[in-house]
Each structure stands twice: as structure tokens, then as C-alpha cells.
């Protein structure tokens, strides 16, 4: 009996060392103009700078929230002057209350 030749088994070879450098956008062929306009796509991320930026933006948002909260508290206050000339802060009252 003749046996049919066995089909070659497809072996998945591990990627070669030179192929690993072509992962992501760094391996895509682009023009020099595109790389000059979009350098952040091709530069390795700098984690300390990213952490500094995240902390800075978080502090800015917290400060804006703080200013908003203090402005809301001051909105209902006005400076009143008594008969002796002393000024003090007084909460606004409505005639309808």
C-alpha cells in the first residue's frame, strides 16, 4: 500500500530579533514630514515626565475646584457697615423668607 505523503506541519517560529523592533508605529514606513509633525508617536514614553504632568494637572484641577467652592461660599455674603463704622461680613437674606 502506498501511503499518501503527510502534509508538512506548519510550525510557528518565534519572531526574530530584528522583527521585534518593528512593533507598533515605530515600524511603520512614514515620511520625514509626518515624523516631524507627530514626534510623540515615535519617541519612547518618558515616565517621570508623564508622572510630573499628571500630578501637575491634578493639582490644577484641585485648585480650580477649591476656588469654585470658596467663590460659592462668598456669593451669599456682603460687607455690612454698622452705625459705629465697623465693617463685617453678613449673609444675604431674602425679603421672601
UniProtKB/Swiss-Prot annotation:
GO terms for cellular component: membrane. It is a single-pass membrane protein. Coiled coil: none annotated. Residues 1-22 are annotated as: Disordered. Residues 9-20 have a biased composition (Basic and acidic residues). The chain crosses the membrane at residues 48-70. Keywords: Membrane, Transmembrane, Transmembrane helix. Pfam families: DUF4500. It is found in: Membrane. Its main location: membrane. Belongs to the SMIM8 family. This is Small integral membrane protein 8. It comes from Bos taurus (Bovine).
Amino acid at each position: 500500500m502506498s501511503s499518501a505523503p503527510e502534509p508538512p506541519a506548519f510550525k510557528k517560529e518565534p519572531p526574530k530579533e530584528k522583527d521585534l523592533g518593528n512593533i507598533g508605529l515605530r515600524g511603520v514606513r512614514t515620511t520625514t514630514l509626518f515624523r516631524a509633525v507627530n514626534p510623540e508617536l515615535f519617541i519612547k514614553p518618558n515616565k517621570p515626565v508623564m508622572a510630573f504632568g499628571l500630578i501637575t494637572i491634578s493639582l490644577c484641577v484641585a485648585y480650580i475646584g477649591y476656588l469654585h467652592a470658596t467663590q460659592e461660599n462668598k456669593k451669599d455674603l456682603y460687607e455690612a457697615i454698622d452705625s459705629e463704622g465697623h465693617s463685617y461680613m453678613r449673609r444675604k437674606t431674602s425679603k421672601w423668607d
